[in-house]
Design a protein with these regions (language model features):
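Structural alpha/beta surface segment adjacent to cysteine/selenocysteine redox centers
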Residues: 1-49
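C-terminal cap of thioredoxin/glutaredoxin-like
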Residues: 44-136
Length: 136
């Protein structure tokens, strides 16, 4: 399933309280970022969710196995995400505000030096820009 559930009538996302996946998923992603494993988390988890190989990515051992590849423990992340939900939600809300401020929504969207990179087809360009910036 899509991590973000929409109302079929309005095509608007359901309120966060009614979302079965996006809350815990973004919280553990934020914890991975804080642990210095954000990109390592992003690759296997996004492949699991959108790669088309697993129908119910959120069930069973699929997610714990994907997260294991990052060197992090899925159960530990979930426990920490529950314990720190308010703090993590504040960070996620601030990130959403920043995303809106640059005129974008959805994922993946990243901004580097005021240049937005939206969509998976722009990640190679972002990577190149980051590499070039390191050379300066």
């Amino acid at each position: 399933p899509d991590p973000l559930v929409f109302d079929k009538q309005t095509m608007e996302p359901l309120p966060l309280a009614d979302q079965p996946h996006i809350g815990w998923l973004t919280r553990i992603a934020q914890l991975a970022v804080e642990a210095g494993a954000g990109m390592a988390f992003l690759d296997p988890v996004t492949r699991l969710i959108w790669g088309g190989m697993v129908e119910n990515w959120h069930e069973g051992e699929h997610m714990p196995r994907a997260v294991m590849d990052t060197g992090l423990d899925f159960n530990d992340l979930c426990a920490q995400a529950d314990a720190e939900a308010e703090r993590l939600d504040a960070i996620i809300d601030a990130n959403n505000d920043t995303l809106s401020a640059v005129g974008h929504w959805g994922v993946p969207c990243m901004v580097f030096e005021d240049e937005p990179f939206f969509g998976q087809d722009r990640m190679d360009l972002l990577s190149w820009r980051l590499d070039e910036a390191q050379k300066r």
